């Protein structure tokens, strides 16, 4: 009798565990779908904020299996990403990073190397005004002196904690850093 009770109890536990696993699988699937929908919304918001062509992209969809991102125009036609200019492609990549960070709900630092190199003036302005100040609690920018002009530096100054310049010393074969950004701390030469 005791063995029958054990067998029945084990069978009940297995059934219960199977049901719990099924519920968890369904929950994970729904959570994944919800996060993907949220990512689509955030990505569209970021692209509309960063791209200077109004209504270039009016909808974003993400495939649930492959996670491939499809951009759509106002007529809901798919826009091949290779038809975007190099600057628009960079803004797309930046938008994806921002949308992922927002979707995670966690503050993530951004480290960006030569962020403005391939951008036209309009996209540069958008990055300076709409991205760098708001991208994260911590944004580290590795740029050249030609990317962040004195004008851009002045615009970013209220958001800067510190800035450093790196100077290569050819005779010594090494690089030294100093406080400031190609100018002194106030952005003056």
Regions found by a protein language model. Give the residues of each.
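Hydrophobic, well-ordered secondary-structure elements that form the walls
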Residues: 47, 92, 113, 127, ...
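GG-anchored amphipathic helix commonly corresponding to the ABC/SMC/Rad50 NBD signature/C-loop
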Residues: 46, 86-111
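C-terminal lobe/lid and adjacent interdomain/linker elements of RecA-like ASCE P-loop ATPase modules
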Residues: 125-189
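Extended, charged coiled-coil "arm/hinge" scaffolds of SMC/Rad50-like chromosome-maintenance ATPases
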Residues: 1-70, 107
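Short polybasic amphipathic segments
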Residues: 67-73, 163-167
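Active/binding-pocket-proximal capping segment
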Residues: 63-65, 87, 110-118, 145
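Conserved D-loop/post-Walker B switch-helix segment of ABC ATPase nucleotide-binding domains
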Residues: 107, 121-127
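Conserved ABC ATPase signature
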Residues: 32, 36-37, 69-96, 115-121
